[in-house]
């Protein structure tokens, strides 16, 4: 088996191209581009600190202008809703509308991936996730990109009890489902100059 990083790159590129084709197919009936479908999927995965145009643009690697145009189109199609932050009225937040949720349910843009990985053992999936996560983390650090991640791996995550959680950075209580969503305030445990306890 070839173990070179170049083969990994070729495989990731090929998978990315195939997934883009799936996202293009998923959006075809609504005349949406893959970037629009990616934006909708992002909103299903983003937590309350990450559902802003700025965070979405960072995650998707888009310019402010491209993101703005994409959101205008999704808003006009009734697939997203914009609302003001409760604490800071200057901040615009985004969420899927009922139509947006229905679109993703009907289109199932990730079903091809689920089908393709159905026979891979959980252990092999874990190993692949670990290798790809390490590659992504290094790539983002080298390019000064925002890492994004879920609460359980974040240095700000505080477990108050078996079912009570808190974001130490923002000071907010978190629900169980929230702790599994992605956050752009994420900092890997041990990051930021703090030593991890042994």
What do these predicted ranges mean?
Residues 1-30:
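N-terminal leader segment of winged-helix/HTH proteins
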Residues 22-33, 114-123:
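Short amphipathic alpha-helical boundary/capping segments
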Residues 40-43, 56, 67, 71-77, ...:
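Basic amphipathic alpha-helical segments that dock to polyanions
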Residues 24-63:
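N-terminal helix-turn-helix DNA-binding core of bacterial DNA-binding proteins
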Residues 73-125:
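Charged, amphipathic alpha-helical coiled-coil/dimerization segments
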Residues 7, 18, 38-42, 102:
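Pre-recognition alpha-helix immediately N-terminal to the DNA-recognition helix
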Residues 155-198:
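Long, low-complexity, charge-rich intrinsically disordered regions
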Residues 106-155:
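Terminal interaction helix/tail motif
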């Amino acid at each position: 088996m070839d173990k070179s990083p170049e083969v990994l790159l070729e495989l990731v590129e090929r998978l990315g191209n195939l997934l883009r084709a799936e996202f293009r197919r998923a959006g075809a009936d609504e005349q949406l581009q893959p970037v629009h479908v990616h934006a909708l999927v992002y909103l299903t995965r983003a937590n309350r600190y990450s559902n802003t145009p700025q965070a979405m643009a960072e995650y998707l690697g888009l310019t402010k202008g491209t993101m703005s145009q994409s959101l205008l189109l999704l808003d006009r199609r009734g697939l997203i809703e914009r609302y003001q932050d409760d604490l800071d009225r200057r901040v615009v937040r985004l969420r899927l509308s009922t139509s947006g949720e229905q679109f993703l349910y009907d289109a199932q843009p990730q079903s091809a991936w689920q089908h393709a990985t159905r026979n891979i053992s959980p252990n092999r999936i874990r190993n692949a996730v670990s290798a790809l996560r390490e590659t992504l983390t290094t790539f983002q650090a080298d390019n000064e990109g925002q890492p994004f991640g879920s609460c359980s791996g974040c240095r700000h995550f505080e477990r108050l009890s078996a079912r009570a959680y808190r974001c130490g950075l923002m000071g907010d209580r978190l629900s169980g489902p929230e702790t599994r969503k992605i956050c752009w305030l994420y900092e890997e445990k041990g990051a930021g100059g703090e030593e991890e306890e042994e």
